[in-house]
């Protein structure tokens, strides 16, 4: 289970991640990853000794539409994704926002396939951070 600080709840948080993040689809999932940049004024300030900065943890949210299946199937897919993301959330930079959207084929996919597709999508989204498309 994700902690309360790690979950996306408000629609504005989901919208910000989807609109501002990188979108990558792999297999049965589509990942929207938004990694905040470091503001230029933050890097110019020297760090104070003995003061540890508290950064917001990486947060995740899930979108599983009715196209995936009935409520039982959707909740099963959501539980699997939540378990898989919990293990991978610590590898994301602090302050990141991750939205995982399950495609209809996720209802029939195994947990191993969901995990492999999720890993591939997150890796591709992180690799795209330096590139600009268009």
From Swiss-Prot:
GO molecular function ontology, one term from the record: tRNA binding
Keyword Nuclease recorded: yes
Keyword Transcription regulation: no
Pfam families (alphabetical): Ribonuclease_P (PF00825)
One GO cellular component, as annotated: ribonuclease P complex
Gene3D superfamilies: 3.30.230.10
Gene Ontology annotations of biological process type: tRNA 5'-leader removal
Alphabetized SUPFAM superfamilies for the sequence: Ribosomal protein S5 domain 2-like
Catalytic activity: Endonucleolytic cleavage of RNA, removing 5'-extranucleotides from tRNA precursor
E.C. number: 3.1.26.5
InterPro entries xrefs: Ribosomal_Su5_D2-typ_SF, Ribsml_uS5_D2-typ_fold_subgr, RNase_P, RNase_P_CS
Keywords carried by this UniProt record: Endonuclease, Hydrolase, Nuclease, RNA-binding, tRNA processing
Subunit description: Consists of a catalytic RNA component (M1 or rnpB) and a protein subunit.
NCBIfam families hit by this protein: rnpA (TIGR00188)
Function: RNaseP catalyzes the removal of the 5'-leader sequence from pre-tRNA to produce the mature 5'-terminus. It can also cleave other RNA substrates such as 4.5S RNA. The protein component plays an auxiliary but essential role in vivo by binding to the 5'-leader sequence and broadening the substrate specificity of the ribozyme.
Protein name: Ribonuclease P protein component
Organism: Salinispora arenicola (strain CNS-205)
């Amino acid at each position: 289970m994700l902690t309360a600080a790690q979950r996306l709840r408000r629609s504005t948080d989901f919208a910000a991640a989807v609109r501002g993040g990188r979108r990558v689809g792999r297999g049965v999932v589509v990942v929207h990853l938004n990694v905040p940049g470091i503001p230029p004024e933050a890097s110019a300030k020297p760090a104070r000794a003995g003061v540890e900065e508290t950064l917001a943890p990486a947060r995740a949210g899930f979108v599983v539409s009715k196209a995936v299946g009935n409520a039982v199937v959707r909740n099963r897919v959501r539980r699997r994704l939540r378990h898989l993301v919990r293990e991978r959330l610590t590898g994301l930079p602090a302050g990141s926002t991750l939205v995982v959207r399950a495609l209809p084929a996720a209802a029939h996919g195994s947990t191993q396939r969901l995990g492999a597709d999720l890993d591939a999508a997150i890796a591709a989204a992180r690799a795209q951070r330096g590139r600009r498309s268009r």
